[in-house]
């Protein structure tokens, strides 16, 4: 499968899942983006169109993260969950953004669940 086909497939899956996955202030959407070397996670309130918080491997808090990409993804998930719980958010809707639930995406989700987020 060529890179163009993979990108088009991911965009199609993303559009299909976004039709059913919505977040609000009490249960925001946990949106994940994975690049080749980094991972980004945001909590989004779709009703007001605002990003409540964002954490990534590029954040200043994560400047010294060591380990594999999966281990860093799990650390980002834990950090996001801790920030969310501090703001009173415990339930979220997980949006994998067209990526397969495998590898770094799964590691981030598991890290967030370990730290107390419910989804």
From Swiss-Prot:
Residues 1-20 are annotated as: Disordered. GO terms for biological process: translation. Pfam families: Ribosomal_L18p. InterPro entries: Ribosomal_uL18_bac-type, Ribosomal_uL18_bac/euk. One of its GO terms (molecular function) is structural constituent of ribosome. This is Large ribosomal subunit protein uL18. Belongs to the universal ribosomal protein uL18 family. Keywords: Ribonucleoprotein, Ribosomal protein, RNA-binding, rRNA-binding. The keyword RNA-binding applies. Part of the 50S ribosomal subunit; part of the 5S rRNA/L5/L18/L25 subcomplex. Contacts the 5S and 23S rRNAs. The keyword Glycoprotein does not apply. It comes from the Bacteria. HAMAP family: Ribosomal_uL18_B. GO terms for cellular component: cytosolic large ribosomal subunit. This is one of the proteins that bind and probably mediate the attachment of the 5S RNA into the large ribosomal subunit, where it forms part of the central protuberance. Signal peptide: none annotated. Residues 9-19 have a biased composition (Basic residues).
